[in-house]
């Protein structure tokens, strides 16, 4: 059996600037997939550290890198693409991700009208509503990572 290939990637669990008073998670709707909400994420370029990729991806996807890194998930987490998406993402079968828990700085301004827009809408939602929006194949990874940060006392 052929070994699966995973694309190295970073993902940001973005909390509003109201954190820790109010715990609200930033999620965005993909412009290319209707009703598909997710956290900002993106590939790690050759020679780039995960933290450098995190800042670059946030700037590219949500128009700001004005964040404070609160914590980092201690391991890399992988998931497989659904068949429909896998064809588009060839040669990769899925992604292996490094997750960061970050807080927007008060001066941060979200702007989805970026050079290559990936999202067409965003909202801040409480934890209890998060999985109502998140696309199905990302839910297990999101649950694992969020449960860890919850257990560690971040929210």
UniProtKB/Swiss-Prot annotation:
The Enzyme Commission number assigned here is: 3.6.1.-
Ranges for domain Nudix hydrolase: 5-147
Q: Which UniProt keywords apply?
A: Hydrolase
Which parts of the sequence form the motif Nudix box? 42-63
* The protein's required cofactors: a divalent metal cation
**An example Gene Ontology molecular-function term:** guanosine-3',5'-bis(diphosphate) 3'-diphosphatase activity
- Pfam families noted in UniProt: NUDIX
One Gene Ontology term of the biological-process aspect is: nucleoside phosphate metabolic process
Fetch the InterPro entries from UniProt: Nudix_hydrolase (IPR020476), NUDIX_hydrolase-like_dom_sf (IPR015797), NUDIX_hydrolase_CS (IPR020084), NUDIX_hydrolase_dom (IPR000086), RppH (IPR022927)
Q: Which CDD domains match?
A: NUDIX_Ap4A_hydrolase_plant_like (cd03671)
Query: What does it do?
Result: Accelerates the degradation of transcripts by removing pyrophosphate from the 5'-end of triphosphorylated RNA, leading to a more labile monophosphorylated state that can stimulate subsequent ribonuclease cleavage.
HAMAP family attached to this UniProt entry: Nudix_RppH
What is the similarity comment for this entry? Belongs to the Nudix hydrolase family. RppH subfamily.
Query: What is the protein name for this chain?
Result: RNA pyrophosphohydrolase
Instruction: Give the organism the record lists.
Output: Nitratiruptor sp. (strain SB155-2)
């Amino acid at each position: 059996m052929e070994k699966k290939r995973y694309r190295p990637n970073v993902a940001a669990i973005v909390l509003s600037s109201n954190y820790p008073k109010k715990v609200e998670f930033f999620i965005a709707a993909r412009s290319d997939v209707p009703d598909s909400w997710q956290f900002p994420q993106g590939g790690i370029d050759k020679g780039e550290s995960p933290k450098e990729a995190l800042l670059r991806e946030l700037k590219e996807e949500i128009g700001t890198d004005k964040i404070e890194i609160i914590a980092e998930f201690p391991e890399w987490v992988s998931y497989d693409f659904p068949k429909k998406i896998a064809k588009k993402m060839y040669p990769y079968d899925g992604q292996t991700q490094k997750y960061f828990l970050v807080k927007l700085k008060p001066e941060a301004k979200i702007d989805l009208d970026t050079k290559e827009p990936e999202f067409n809408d965003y909202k801040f939602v409480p934890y209890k509503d998060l999985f109502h929006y998140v696309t199905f194949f990302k839910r297990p990874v999101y649950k694992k990572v969020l449960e860890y940060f919850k257990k560690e006392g971040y929210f």
